[in-house]
């Protein structure tokens, strides 16, 4: 049985291959990368607001929106879910020390 992420990703790929005129996913593909990136930015802002408001239910919904739009971008850029999973697997379990990370100085 496939997980929800895989099913969503495959549905988005199918919309790219076989567009449906009333599909929001199709609309994003027609508008192109700039529109997709704009939506990712908007949804990330909504994640921040939901988190700052301590609204767990809204935060979950907005995170799903971010993931959906990121999946649309991955399909647009011809990056597979397997590519992402390989990178996650490679990073998983690696020892990472705070000193190995860039300083975050914009806060």
Swiss-Prot record:
Keywords assigned: Amino-acid biosynthesis, ATP-binding, Cytoplasm, Histidine biosynthesis, Hydrolase, Nucleotide-binding
UniProt superkingdom: Bacteria
A molecular-function term among this protein's GO annotations: ATP binding
EC code: 3.6.1.31
Recorded GO CC terms: cytoplasm
One Pfam family recorded for the sequence: PRA-PH
Cell compartments where the protein resides: Cytoplasm
Catalytic activity: 1-(5-phospho-beta-D-ribosyl)-ATP + H2O = 1-(5-phospho-beta-D-ribosyl)-5'-AMP + diphosphate + H(+)
Segments traversing the membrane: none
SUPFAM superfamilies cross-referenced by the UniProt entry: all-alpha NTP pyrophosphatases
Pathway annotation: Amino-acid biosynthesis; L-histidine biosynthesis; L-histidine from 5-phospho-alpha-D-ribose 1-diphosphate: step 2/9
UniProt keyword Nucleotide-binding present: yes
NCBIfam families: histidine_hisI
Similarity remark: Belongs to the PRA-PH family.
Protein name (record): Phosphoribosyl-ATP pyrophosphatase
Organism: Bacillus cereus (strain Q1)
Native organism taxonomy: Bacteria, Bacillati, Bacillota, Bacilli, Bacillales
Gene: hisE
């Amino acid at each position: 049985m496939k997980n929800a992420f895989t099913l969503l990703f495959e549905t988005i790929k199918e919309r790219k291959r076989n567009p449906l005129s009333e599909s929001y996913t199709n609309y994003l593909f027609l508008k192109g990368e700039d529109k997709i990136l704009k939506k990712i930015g908007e949804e990330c802002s909504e994640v921040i607001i939901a988190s700052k408001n301590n609204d767990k239910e809204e935060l979950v919904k907005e995170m799903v929106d971010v993931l959906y739009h990121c999946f649309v971008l991955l399909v647009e850029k011809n990056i597979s879910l397997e590519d992402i999973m390989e990178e996650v697997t490679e990073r998983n379990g690696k020892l990472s020390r705070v000193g190995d990370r860039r300083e975050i100085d914009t806060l």
